[in-house]
Amino acid sequence: GYDSKAFAIALEKIAERYSDRVNSGSKIFIYLESPCNPHGYVLDVPGICKRAHELGHRVIVDPTVGTPFLQPLLKIADRMERPDFVLHSYTKDLAGTGTTTAGVVIGRNEDMFVPKNSSVEATWPDGSYRTVNWDQSMFWNVYYIKGGFLDADKAFEVLNGMKTYEMRVLQKAINTVVLAKVLSTHPCINVSCPVLEENPNHTLLEKHMYLGLPA
């Protein structure tokens, strides 16, 4: 399924299956990809985020296929409906050249970096307070220990490619609409694309994607 109801059912099953780990202190993180690659299915990200946050879980979303142009998740007004972290691959549409192997993680300041040996007061999506220690932030817990930073040349390639990314993404979306609708008129071709009104995912596409455009 694509909506929050299907998610709630799946989450309940997972929580039950791994109840021993959850009870011993392990955390549940929700990882979503929307639009999904390669079919372009759109998930009800705001609805899923709200349900997950109500249960105290954190949400990570990869909208690489849609890009921030078609699916600007961080502009969602209600923080309960907004993911905690957003991931993007620079390698694909953002840079557009395919010459840069890189990605980005976007989150709130206190989740990304806290000065060493210190802590900060922050809030959960529901407004309740929490304390974030320095070793819980992304910089110290992941980047510093396990990953590297993008070098200057690759960063330049990404920034240079992003000058045209909105134009490229828009043209690709228009091409998808035209191609899907033309092919769907052929009696011997079965087209599965959310942009078609008869597709079961069409309503979510219209609701959550910019101008109802497909990725």
Predicted feature residues:
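Conserved PLP-binding catalytic core of the aspartate aminotransferase-like
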Residues: 191-215
